[in-house]
């Protein structure tokens, strides 16, 4: 930061619920329910902006693919709970207390605990397909973007989704292999938008 004296804002994207400077429901040890924003403000003179990591990924995807005004960005990593970012009419939906997109709290009827299912391709398919089904009946985005290392055969997911939604048209399903690039773009976009 010393090398960049004109830097006016420090921005972080973090896993979990980011609300009023506090982080909750995160797997990062030592920050649960801590007011990270206040701690950083005490140390740095720059503005501090904190965002949920998958919300910024959703915004990054939207900014680079703006033809999709309504999208759902689903992140399902190995051995972790799922998270999502929601864009409706070109706007990021964070919801009350920034809970929108916390899909790991959905009362899905799963065959095992989500943490266990997320360790195998079959389990991941079960989680992702049921989240897609729920999403379609709640938000109905035209595009669902998915990051998951354990879904190598995307055709199987498309078939499972068609099976679950046999009476309705399914959205366009898009697999991304790198979520970091979308996080970076989305974080820069949101940060610049707030600073202006």
Where are the regions a protein language model picked out?
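Glycine-rich phosphate-binding loop of actin/hexokinase-like ATP-binding domains
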Residues: 69-115
């Amino acid at each position: 930061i010393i090398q960049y004296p004109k830097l006016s804002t420090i921005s972080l994207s973090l896993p979990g619920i980011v609300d009023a400077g506090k982080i909750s429901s995160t797997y990062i040890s030592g920050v649960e329910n801590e007011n990270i924003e206040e701690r950083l403000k005490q140390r740095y003179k720059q503005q501090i902006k904190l965002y949920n990591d998958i919300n910024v990924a959703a915004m990054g995807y939207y900014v680079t693919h703006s033809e999709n005004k309504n999208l759902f960005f689903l992140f399902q990593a190995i051995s972790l709970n799922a998270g999502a970012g929601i864009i409706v009419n070109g706007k990021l939906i964070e919801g009350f207390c920034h809970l929108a997109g916390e899909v790991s709290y959905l009362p899905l009827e799963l065959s095992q605990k989500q943490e266990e299912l997320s360790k195998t391709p079959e389990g991941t398919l079960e989680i992702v397909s049921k989240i897609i089904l729920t999403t379609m009946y709640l938000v109905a985005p035209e595009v669902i973007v998915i990051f998951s290392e354990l879904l190598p055969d995307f055709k199987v997911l498309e078939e499972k989704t068609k099976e679950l939604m046999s009476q309705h048209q399914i959205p366009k399903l898009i697999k991304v292999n790198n979520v970091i690039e979308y996080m970076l773009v989305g974080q820069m976009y949101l940060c610049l938008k707030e600073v202006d």
